[in-house]
Amino acid sequence: MAPKKKVSALIKLQIQAGKANPAPPLGPALGSHGVNIMDFCKAYNAQTQDKMGQVIPVEITVYEDRSFTFVLKTPPAAALLKKAAGIEKGTENPLTHKVGSVTKAQVREIAETKMEDLSARDIEAGMKIIEGTARSMGITVTD
């Protein structure tokens, strides 16, 4: 068995799918750790081609020999909720100003998509997390 590589950094970024390029914010974040930026961009764009238009969070592990690995996460719950509600952005004041609504079925679908990244044991708990995000954005959840 090969010896384990030492991790030098863990970088978390949110990048448009298929649109990673060396320009800021990606270039400086990776360049400061000595990562070959173009290698990362090519690999990321190849893996996210089928998800164009979505923001895909990525967790990049940089090793001391300047090599890297990365793990793609599911899109942010807020982005999925905005898409489901058909709105551009959430509200500034969620208590008084509601900007849209989603159904329980849509919330369940989003929770199923996000389940691997949520800290919930079952789908019902995942739905509660997504409903809380919706409320904080000024989106009402209807039956």
Swiss-Prot record:
Q: Which SUPFAM superfamilies match?
A: Ribosomal L11/L12e N-terminal domain, Ribosomal protein L11, C-terminal domain
Q: What does this protein do?
A: Forms part of the ribosomal stalk which helps the ribosome interact with GTP-bound translation factors.
The UniProt GO MF terms for this protein read: large ribosomal subunit rRNA binding; structural constituent of ribosome
Record's Gene3D superfamilies?
Ribosomal protein L11, C-terminal domain, Ribosomal protein L11/L12, N-terminal domain
Please list the disulfide bridges: none
What is an example of a Pfam family matching this protein?
Answer: Ribosomal_L11
Instruction: Please indicate if the UniProt record lists Cell inner membrane as a keyword.
Output: no
Name its GO BP terms in alphabetical order. translation
Q: Write the protein's name.
A: Large ribosomal subunit protein uL11
Task: Return the similarity comment.
Answer: Belongs to the universal ribosomal protein uL11 family.
One cellular component term (GO) for this entry is: cytosolic large ribosomal subunit
Q: Which InterPro entries does the protein's record reference?
A: Ribosomal_uL11, Ribosomal_uL11_bac-typ, Ribosomal_uL11_C, Ribosomal_uL11_C_sf, Ribosomal_uL11_CS, Ribosomal_uL11_N, Ribosomal_uL11_N_sf
Which organism is this entry from?
Bifidobacterium longum subsp. infantis (strain ATCC 15697 / DSM 20088 / JCM 1222 / NCTC 11817 / S12)
